[in-house]
Amino acid sequence: MSSEVKINFNWTPQDSHKTKDLLLQLVPWRKGPFSINEVFIDSEWRSHFKWDRFLELDLDLNDKTVLDVGSGNGYYGFRMLGLGAKEVLCLEPNLTHFSQFLAINNFAKSKKIQMLPERLESIQIDTPYFDVIFSMGLLYHQRDPGKHLRLLAAHLKKEGRIVIETIVTPEDYEEVLVPSDRYANMPNVWSVHSEIGLEKLILEQGLELIDSTEAIMTTIEEQRATQWMPFGSFESALEEGNHERTIEGFPTPLRKFVVITIQNNQL
């Protein structure tokens, strides 16, 4: 799973048709793709695009305990195992995504990855446990993004790493853009920070930014409707004929990774 999530084993053509029909009952498949023999789950997001951007950071996951918050169906968790993670715990309260994970791991049969249908705020761990914690596509959905960062840090081992993937806005909006309603047709987007605003937010929580990737514009090649997610997708969130503006008139989302750690003697 270092290059893709692909599972191969012996089965009959009848098994293939039955499996595809059953997996299609779990739409929408947001993250992927997955290959189970010849069954190709062509998800809405080509999530390997994002994972390739993460790989630019060259962050070592070998023999690490990893937490993936808001993990969706576990696609990235399986990719983390492909980089040698010792164990991965995924948190995902959406029961459709949870069911998709159970279906995939029914074939993968990995004991190194588990998923709880819980939010970060619900888990109780007495001591910091994780070497690396991922929060991807969550920060802008938080009413209190600073609290979210502090909760992540509370579960992080000393000298561990937090990986944030989020949307950033151009500096035209100064430190933060606060949509009055939707952003790129997404509800519950409470704040979108500029790169300067994001770094300031991180520092205010007693954390330190130590690495980042370039901010990359989301495209309709990366996120689109498919048989496995047959509803409105990213193209419907953009101005007709202008893929650099959303239907609300905002800049099209720019996504980037940042790696942060706890400052000395903080938290």
PLM regions with names:
Residues 1-51, 106, 178-180, 199, ...:
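N-terminal accessory regions of S-adenosyl-L-methionine
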Residues 73-84:
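Conserved SAM-binding loop of SAM-dependent methyltransferases across substrates and taxa
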Residues 190-206:
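Short alpha-helix
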Residues 64-72:
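Conserved class I S-adenosyl-L-methionine
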Residues 131-144:
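A short SAM/SAH-binding and catalytic strip from SAM-dependent methyltransferases
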Residues 123-133:
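A short acidic, Gly/Pro-enriched loop at the edge of an enzyme's catalytic core
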Residues 146-161:
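A short glycine-rich, Lys/Arg-flanked "PGG" loop and its adjoining helix->strand segment in the class I
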Residues 167-189:
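Short, glycine-/aromatic-enriched active-site segment of Class I SAM-dependent methyltransferases
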